[in-house]
Amino acid sequence: MSKNDKKNKQSGSSNMDQLKSEDILQAVVLGDSFDRKFAPITLEKPRTLLPLVNIPLLDYTLEFLAASGVQQIFVFCCAHASQIKEYIQSSRWHDLPGVQVICMTGSNCRTTGDALRGVYDAQVIQSDFILISGDVVSNMNLQKALQIHKDRRELDKNNIMTMVYKQASSTHRTRSKQDDTVIWCNRDTMQVVCYDNSPSKKKSSISVELFQKHPSIQMRYDLIDCHIDICSPEVLALFNDNFDFADIRKDFIHDILTSDLLDYKLSAYVLQGEYAARVKDLRTYHSVSKDIIHRWTFPMVPDNNFMCNSSYSLSRQMIYKEKNVKLLGDCLISDETVIGTQTEIGAGSIVSHSTIGRNCIIGKNVKINGSYIWDDVTIQDNAIIDHSIICNGSIIKSSSIIGRGSIIGFNVYIGQSKTLEPFSKITMAQYNEDEDDEELLEEYFKEINLNDDNNNNNNNNNENNKTNRWLMENELYNELVPRINDSIHDDIESDESGDEGDKSGGKIKNNKNNDDNPIEPDSVKFHREVGDTIRRGIIEKLPLENIQLEINGLKFAYDRDGLDCLTSILPVLLESSSSSSSTTDSVTPKELQQFIAGRISAFSPLLVKFSSEDSMVDLIFKIQDFCDENEKFKVVFQPILHQLYENDVISEEAIFEWAEEIEGDEEDDGFYLKKCKGFIDWLKSAEEESDDSDDSDDDDDDSDESD
């Protein structure tokens, strides 16, 4: 342990002197994964600081512990320890009331066992504690699990560890293929009697002798290991006494359960309806990201802004945006997308099922699908990014294609019209001469040239640095998306070789024509083709009946509904002018209002064909989202609504229902409700006058009948 760590430990101890040691709930966070499953990214940055939906992984773990009442958290750092310490010092964890986060370092640690022996040597753990990986995301009720662990300890002091599991199917998206756990446990006490974590094995067996002690044993293959353990101090002592313990699951648990000398017991705690998952490889990184976007991790979701340094808001289709995001022209932001502040997306670009960080510049006609774009990335016009990770500071030049499953490291420069084949891994990192396996590690790097073909007068710093292709092949299933041959390997041993063509880490070639788009999802294709149909109809002045026939054909071909059609038609009608050479960008609000009135009136027979009572409220919200993404239309939201009402595309009932839904929102939705107040009041007064007129007519009829 370094001098600074000793000082931190001493200051930490003095600050907690007022509390009795048994009253302090402590946790040990493993800040190192001791593997290369995120290489080459983790050659430059620790896994715990990698962004997951634009928030460092470590923040999810610390937030979970703090919310669970943990008062003292020790983060044990090994690789890139200085980065973790610097991050904690500069974050809210440095002085958060009620929670003390202390960094400990072990520069010579090579395994989890070494780290736990380091914690033992520090003598900072006083009682039962939480042992957790620094890449865990959870919203579980930890206090309930702690109480069950304490109750078990009172009954039997030899019950030294409770392991947390989540019930899920064997094919669940957050279940890593390399963490294929089978446990055998006492049905009544949940004591674990046998543990098997061998993905290559086709069957699991148990000793018959165990049934003499445990008459009722159940086999559980429906559990995901959350890597959250509630431990007694004896666990650290056992690691200190056994230097051959390198891994908790493979060594410690196996030894405890099979030892004839030790009488220690391990138990399981199974979550019901709560969330916990570890981001242990690229596949689970993708899965947990989707779970966060779909709000399974609530309250740790983007729009809850739980780290107090973000400004996300949620709109329909699971789209999260921070403030000061610029969406230009007719760019399309599709489902399951997160966009950080100060990011700009150019006209004609399509972003779907992706996370984009802060301060990114996305050019025109860029296509990004299923990808993770971190902070300060530049992607120029006509580039295609397919299910890939682009790390901070990288530059992707125009017309380049990043194949599915690729990883682009920090500050990498991809030249114009370059194509990276699927599962390429590119890094600016160089092999470390201080590594123990220097010769082996050097073999993982191969220098490549990704600069522009005509690279005579470029001043970009990224271009002039040495770029390497990372050649270390990932373990089976450890890719952001499945390889084609993954399904083949489901039925064979995991140590057999995969597709030889992928071992090079991906080839690079020039791309002069990327018209064929290999990544466009059906929803995006439909939106684009309907938009093209409307634009062609405007320019060529086609009859509305012909346009309707074409859109109906697309509707059935892509299995879309009327609302999908309207949300694809309206943006084009509003953005495009009657002349193909002019747009709405330079007109005044009054001119824009007049243009909208004429355009909606002219196309109302077409719009009515796709409108239905069931979808009218949703259509209003879609128009609101469109105005959010296109600032110039915010001021004419009410005229758009008015024209759609006048032309029977939406009803007054739908407008009333929309207003009722957003009433009380003073920020985002409140702006639109305020804009429409006069129009809604007019509708209500007109409705009341109509009701009064109807009542008067009824009275006249009654009097006539009485006469």
Swiss-Prot record:
Residues 688-707 have a biased composition (Acidic residues). One of its GO terms (biological process) is cytoplasmic translational initiation. Keywords: Cytoplasm, Transferase. It is found in: Cytoplasm, Cytosol. GO terms for cellular component: cytosol; eukaryotic translation initiation factor 2B complex. GO terms for molecular function: guanyl-nucleotide exchange factor activity; transferase activity; translation initiation factor activity; translation initiation factor binding. InterPro entries: ARM-type_fold, eIF-2B_epsilon_N, eIF2B_epsilon, NTP_transferase_dom, Nucleotide-diphossugar_trans, W2_domain, W2_eIF2B_epsilon. Residues 516-693 form the W2 domain. Residues 489-526, 686-707 are annotated as: Disordered. Its main location: cytoplasm. SMART domains: eIF5C. Acts as a component of the translation initiation factor 2B (eIF2B) complex, which catalyzes the exchange of GDP for GTP on eukaryotic initiation factor 2 (eIF2) gamma subunit. Its guanine nucleotide exchange factor activity is repressed when bound to eIF2 complex phosphorylated on the alpha subunit, thereby limiting the amount of methionyl-initiator methionine tRNA available to the ribosome and consequently global translation is repressed. Component of the translation initiation factor 2B (eIF2B) complex which is a heterodecamer of two sets of five different subunits: alpha, beta, gamma, delta and epsilon. Subunits alpha, beta and delta comprise a regulatory subcomplex and subunits epsilon and gamma comprise a catalytic subcomplex. Within the complex, the hexameric regulatory complex resides at the center, with the two heterodimeric catalytic subcomplexes bound on opposite sides. Belongs to the eIF-2B gamma/epsilon subunits family. This is Translation initiation factor eIF2B subunit epsilon. It comes from Dictyostelium discoideum.
